[in-house]
UniProtKB/Swiss-Prot annotation:
Belongs to the YajQ family. Keywords: Nucleotide-binding. PANTHER family: UPF0234 PROTEIN YAJQ (PTHR30476:SF0). GO terms for molecular function: nucleotide binding. NCBIfam families: PRK05412.1. The keyword Transmembrane does not apply. This is Nucleotide-binding protein AM1_1863. It comes from Acaryochloris marina (strain MBIC 11017). InterPro entries: DUF520, UPF0234-like_C, UPF0234_N, YajQ-like_sf. GO terms for cellular component: cytosol.
Amino acid sequence: MASTCSFDIVSDFEWQELVNAIDQANREIKARYDLKDTKTEIKLDPTEITISTDSEFTLDAVHNVLQTKAVKRKLSLKIFDYGIIESASGNRVRQAIKLQKGIDTELAKKISKLIRTDYKKVQASIQGEVVRVSSKSKDDLQQVMQDLKQEDWPVALQFTNYR
């Protein structure tokens, strides 16, 4: 009769879109009059972005450029976890921005508990950094997605692996 339907809740981002956003930000920084001579560098590592520039004022402008480019590439700003601003050599400042990927166990438990309390016919199971939601009714699953989108979570949630 009715088979079980499911989907996964993940927190992830497109790596290539992030690379493109940083490339566009670097180009704009080199072309903008107020940022042209600041020798600003944006370096991308697999786990973080490092920004090195002249002053905190310039750093704020670079943040603005980076965020604008990320939004245009359909990246959530919740993937950026800004670290502390530290002074570097030559009167420069540096900041590391950690890239948030995956749902930690505590947040997965909150999501799972919210689903279990609000929907009796829906099951949520934690599988590492993924929360699998399953039910016999597709309508219930769609309602769960709508309710999760309404909440303000500390990470960007995506829904994948529809079955």
